[in-house]
Amino acid sequence: MRSLAILATSLALTAAVVSAKCDPTKWSPPVDGQYNTTGRIDPNKLNVHLIAHSHDDPGWLMGVDQYYMEKVQYILDTAVEELVRNPDRQFMFVEQSFFQRWWHQQGSEVRGIVKQLVKEGRLDLTVNGGWCMHDEATPHYIAMVDQTAYGHQLLMDEFGISPRIGWQIDPFGHSATQGSLLSQGVGFDALYFARIDYQDYGQRIKTKDLEFIWRPSKSRGKESQVFTGEIVDTYCPPGKFEYGNIGNEIQDDADLHDYDVCGEVDQFVKTAQSRGAVSKGSHIFIPMGCDFQYDNSLRWFKNMDKLIHYVNQDDRLNVLYSNLSYYTDMKRAEG
């Protein structure tokens, strides 16, 4: 009897501590296990576009085949499964050297599902689209054009699509050739990258010029210009929002001692607001992915579902699953 009393007291104290830290009644729970991830633009708030992606170098610390066998095939397998689970979810995949290998190993059922996801824009293959994400310093421009054209031709043959967004997030430094010939020149509406000189980056932070119109060719002038964006910090998520890491999960079970939806929401809101403060307009994007992430796509999407569900109840931000084409359209519409 005494042990039952001690247990009851312990549970009461735990509930009191949790309640004092974060009141669970403040938040609407998921309905029938489903989180509200419906995405729409709110003109009166900062709109945060979550871009789910995996950066997959065809050869880095391991060889191409090792990466495919140990990581990439599972990234694509599980990403497709999770997109099917929730029609609001989106995922971007870039490196055609990996995608085409995976594609040719799929049966008719999976191919049909993938074609539908691509048609809906939820499996986004319209970003970069080259065989790899080429370096911009050492390759000859012909090699850059060839590998880009090869990837684009495969996408046109299989899906009838042409990439419209440049995504050069890992090359160190960016050339006029990329900006002119391989961005505007191939029909890209925008180019995004993540590695520029730290002094340039610092100045653009101060002046809110991380996104700008780049005219890489003086002789061609406006004909060569392309909307360009430098990513804040890195192409990986900020802080604990990298859900591929164990321990970063959102704990929203109010019966457990580490329940802290309030803290998760507040940290994300402050992070997004700090990025909004160095950007122009009412739209920012946060890349949700990193090197060879999403081999367990459920971990990522389940936590992003929770993030969207709870942050949008907070009323300080509007968060949605998105893709770079949609984000670019929203930025261009703002002028």
List the predicted regions and their residue ranges.
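Catalytic-domain carbohydrate-binding cleft regions of carbohydrate-active enzymes
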Residues: 19-335
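Cleavable N-terminal signal peptides of Sec/SRP-targeted secreted and luminal proteins
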Residues: 2-20
